[in-house]
Amino acid sequence: AAPREWLHVLGVSQLTWAVYLSAIQRGIRANVNEEFTVSFDSASPYMMAGRFQQYAITPHISGNMDDWVLRHQLLPMGYAVANAKKTQPFPQSSPVANKLSLQDFNPRRGQFDVKTTDDLSDEVLCNHNVYVYLRAFRDANEAVFKRDGVAAQELKDACSFIESLFAMKDWQSALELRKESLQAILNREPVSDIDSDIER
């Protein structure tokens, strides 16, 4: 049979899962198939913008697992925001959102407008969220796999172990011995209320 070259995982929004999947890819490439790819997707950036009008907050990746979470905040909206006399900047930073103010996100300024945002606002919010997620996944991987990465040693050791599984003959026994500690690391990463709603 032809070798399998791609594994895609649905619905990954946790940074720890992102680095675990990278460790799997590294282990397979080093020991089984150097062309193998592990990928994943996440609907959260789009659902946050479209359903919840939430913007993603860039996490501060550090050695503290409490920092390894993608948090979200409600976009300031409404008549008062749309008609504010002083231009207010967008609360977070991303290439597209940096060019717009909160008033740009709220172009409908009528007293009786039920919704002060529009379709362009939703699209820009999606763009911002996707950027924050992608950057966070990249930063998380660098924190674990770069020589001077700032991730907790426990997480680095876990990823190193995952990589090593693909060189073991009796990997099942090794994984059985470590599975609870691997799961414990995943359980320590906070999950925001929005992600909890999405998962339900």
Each language-model region and where it sits:
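C-terminal extensions of enzymes
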Residues: 71-200
